[in-house]
């Protein structure tokens, strides 16, 4: 079970790192030079700081549930939803931009969601809910 905890802590750390980056200078998370168009993530970020909040919630849920060894499956499922939402917004937004926006971050986010889903299954197989 130590391996599951280690990976869960690392995954929580990745979400919390994104929060810190989002709260830092915008040059750390926004790519200039896409043109006058804005991505879907930027549109939502301009309304409210949704993504720092979502990544904080996801990271803290995974961190605390792993420490307590309770609710880990649900925490990873929530984190998977956050990463999938973020990744899909990046990828779908890139489709509509001319020229298309880079999709690397969106692709990484989708795979992070898949890894969180896999971790939720791995914890469930260990009998931890």
Task: Enumerate the predicted regions with their spans.
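Juxtamembrane helix-break-helix junctions at the cytosolic face
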Residues: 59-74
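Membrane-helix boundary connector in multi-pass membrane proteins
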Residues: 70-73, 77-80, 84-105
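Alpha-helical transmembrane segments of polytopic membrane proteins
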Residues: 45-55, 101-110
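Conserved binding/catalytic microenvironments
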Residues: 26, 55, 61, 98
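Hydrophobic transmembrane helix segments
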Residues: 4-53
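Interfacial segments of alpha-helical transmembrane regions
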Residues: 2-12, 72-79
């Amino acid at each position: 079970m130590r391996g599951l905890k280690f990976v869960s802590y690392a995954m929580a750390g990745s979400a919390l790192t994104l929060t810190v980056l989002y709260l830092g200078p915008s040059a750390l998370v926004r790519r200039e030079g896409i043109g006058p168009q804005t991505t879907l993530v930027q549109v939502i970020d301009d309304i409210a700081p949704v993504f720092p909040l979502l990544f904080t919630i996801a990271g803290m849920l995974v961190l605390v549930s792993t420490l307590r060894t309770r609710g880990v499956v649900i925490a990873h499922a929530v984190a998977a939803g956050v990463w999938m939402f973020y990744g899909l917004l990046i990828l779908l937004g890139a489709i509509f931009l001319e020229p298309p926006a880079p999709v690397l971050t969106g692709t990484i986010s989708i795979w992070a969601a898949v890894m969180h889903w896999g971790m939720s299954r791995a914890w469930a197989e260990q009998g931890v809910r």
